[in-house]
Amino acid sequence: MYAVFQSGGKQHRVSEGQTLRLEKLDVETGATVEFDNVLMIANGEEITVGAPLVAGGKVTAEVVQHGRGDKVKIVKFRRRKHSRKQQGHRQWFTEVKITGISA
């Protein structure tokens, strides 16, 4: 059984027991989170596609940890001008473990 749900402006295909990183959620570590923006649920041969959402569809997850991703360097360089600007960015994330999918 797997589901496709939307969180943080992105769509994720998940199954039970899977761990994934989402955009930062404002919840405590160890808390349970429910996602009701479910776009599709597949249970064996039976596939339910929402228009746009599946009625009564829910994905339940447990928050494992919060953290920051790897550093991304941004470099702005102007040739022949002796001008260079360098900046770094680390995006916050929330790691969750999928505990249940219901239709």
Swiss-Prot record:
Transmembrane segments: none annotated. Keywords: Ribonucleoprotein, Ribosomal protein, RNA-binding, rRNA-binding. Pfam families: Ribosomal_L21p. GO terms for cellular component: cytoplasm; ribonucleoprotein complex; ribosome. The keyword rRNA-binding applies. It comes from the Bacteria. This protein binds to 23S rRNA in the presence of protein L20. NCBIfam families: L21. This is Large ribosomal subunit protein bL21. The gene is rplU.
